[in-house]
Design a protein with these regions (language model features):
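Catalytic cores of carbohydrate-active enzymes across secretory and cytosolic contexts
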Residues: 1-491
Length: 491
């Protein structure tokens, strides 16, 4: 079996893949270890042009090579901070109101994709399969094809794919979807995402969609599929139990003084519905005086993308809301919302989940939401907490034992909290068992192995006449900044 080449915007470090990172890194690393291969992408460093062009830096861990490159300031601003996170991220999360479009940022996005492709080509072998991840890399396969690469190339979109009416707000939407069609297999988190893509293909690209997700568009044939990302639930359960008596859990327990605990953990992102969540919790305190002083919401939300301006606003909004609600309902010995702006080790989070009575996960839009799955997996089967989950998380389709809410309905969310806080143990157990069965049926290994099986089954493209893997004509046509000059136009 050929090697696996994983490409993602950020590459986990070899240490992170051994457990401290999210499940994705662990899952992908598992596949890399099986076949041997390369994990290629940005190191997370902003560097000089000389250093960037000298890369990639290679680090070996058994049969796996971690290959990373630095980005120049301009690349970072245009590709990462600009088009990826100020255009694609908001639009793909249905927040056109927060999106901007700048031609030079889009040009930078394409330039960096072409440059990354050029760097990767030198590491490729003929029977490798390539698996690219997420919205930073929509044009990556097209850039590899321009370098003469004929290997199988797959893509998995971790975030929602928006309906065409939303997507067409991005001026070069057609060029982006055309680029996406250079992949051999596109994986989505949910049926809704896949349908939205098919809808675009049929109505805007005049392509065809056949049963089995077979798509023909822009002169290309490709496949699409739904692959719901999961977790390893039994490993999480074991981890949560193992650490349940550690000091941090004891400290939290003691400070709660018998109060019920609602736990929320997210990256600080406007897609996660944090302000709406705080307001729903406020509704609970307002409508149910018996819970005042008797329930605490712990919100853990470390800042991300802090140099993108919309992320500064969400931080301010949230601090304001937490302060306002706490001002209204705090007592000398009671703070209703504990809002923590920091990252926690994974094992700590899992043991805190186990200690809580409610997991409150209410994104406005989310590809899957692994926190919801982790929360369920971390529960004590004898006395499980209840998951209150947004209908707009991909996970809602599988976790049917949860209380499903609409995050725009603060009273509805408040009622779900009331119900969860007083739910009898036999109902909690029944709901937990349903959710746990879904997690076990479709764990992270199933996601990864099914996707890779389907990618390996894609018919291979005919090899280029010179048998090139980037050593042929495509790779030699270079502009000054290192991007192939046959990369698509900037806008
Ligand atoms: P994210 O938007 O990052 O992922 P999510 O799926 O919830 O969202 O994954 C977050 C991961 O980070 C979880 O494993 C969680 O435990 C961890 N995490 C969150 N807050 C943390 C904290 N304070 N400290 C430490 N760890 C923390 C994107 C998409 C999702 C999709 C995933 C995977 O937006 O929709 O589910 O990719 O495909």
């Amino acid at each position: 079996m050929g090697r696996l080449i994983v490409v993602s915007n950020r590459v986990a470090t070899p240490t992170e893949t051994k457990g401290s990172a999210g499940g994705l890194a662990v899952g992908v690393f598992g596949a890399l270890k099986d076949t041997g291969g390369v994990w290629f992408g940005w190191s997370g460093d902003v560097v000089s042009e000389t250093v960037a062009n000298a890369g990639p830096t290679l680090e070996q861990d058994g049969a796996v090579t971690f290959a990373t490159v630095g980005l120049t300031r301009k690349d970072y601003d245009q590709y990462y901070r600009g088009f990826s996170n100020a255009t694609l991220w908001p639009v793909f999360h249905y927040r056109n109101d927060l999106a901007r479009y700048e031609r030079d940022e889009y040009a930078g996005y394409r330039r960096v994709n072409a440059w990354l492709a050029h760097k990767l080509v030198k590491l490729l072998q003929p029977d490798d399969i390539i698996w690219a991840h997420d919205y930073h890399l929509l044009p990556f396969a097209e850039a590899l094809r321009a370098e003469g690469v004929t290997n199988r190339i797959g893509f998995f979109l971790h975030i929602p794919f928006p309906s065409p009416q939303i997507l067409i707000n991005i001026p070069p939407h057609e060029e982006l979807v055309k680029s996406l069609c250079c992949y051999d297999l596109i994986g989505f988190q949910t049926d809704t995402d896949q349908l939205a893509f098919h809808d675009y293909i049929e109505r805007h690209a005049r392509g065809t969609v056949k049963p089995g997700g077979n798509v023909e568009a822009f002169g290309r044939k490709l496949r699409t599929g739904v692959y719901r990302i999961g977790v390893f639930p039994d490993e999480i359960a074991e981890q949560a139990k193992r650490y349940e008596s550690r000091q941090h859990v004891m400290d939290l327990k003691q400070s709660l003084e018998g109060r019920k605990l609602i736990m929320s953990v997210d990256r600080l992102d406007y897609s996660k519905g944090l302000v709406e969540r705080f307001r729903a919790f406020e509704q609970l305190l307002e409508r149910s005086p018996e819970w005042r002083g008797n329930v605490t919401l712990v919100q853990i939300a470390p800042p991300t993308r802090a140099d993108v301006s919309t992320y500064q606003h969400i931080r301010q909004d949230l601090e304001y809301e937490a302060g306002r609600i706490n001002g209204r309902y705090s007592g000398l010995d009671y703070t209703p919302i504990r809002y923590l702006n920091q990252r926690y080790d994974r094992w700590k989070l899992m043991s805190l989940f186990r200690e809580s009575q409610i997991g409150f996960v209410t994104p406005l839009h989310d590809g899957m939401n692994l926190v919801a799955k982790e929360y369920v997996a971390a529960q004590n089967p004898d006395d499980p907490g209840v998951l209150v989950l947004s209908m707009f998380a991909g996970a809602a389709a599988e976790l049917t034992g949860s209380l499903i809410v609409n995050p725009h309905d603060s009273v509805g969310m408040c009622e779900a909290l009331q119900r969860a806080l007083s739910m009898p143990v036999d109902e909690r157990q029944r709901r937990y068992e349903m959710n746990m069965a879904a997690l076990r049926k479709n764990d992270l290994g199933v996601w990864r192995d099914t996707y890779l099986r389907d990618l390996r089954a894609v018919p291979l493209m005919k090899a280029a006449p010179n048998g090139a893997h980037g050593t042929g004509a495509g790779a030699s046509r270079k502009t000054q900044d290192g991007a192939p000059d046959d990369a698509p136009a900037a806008s």
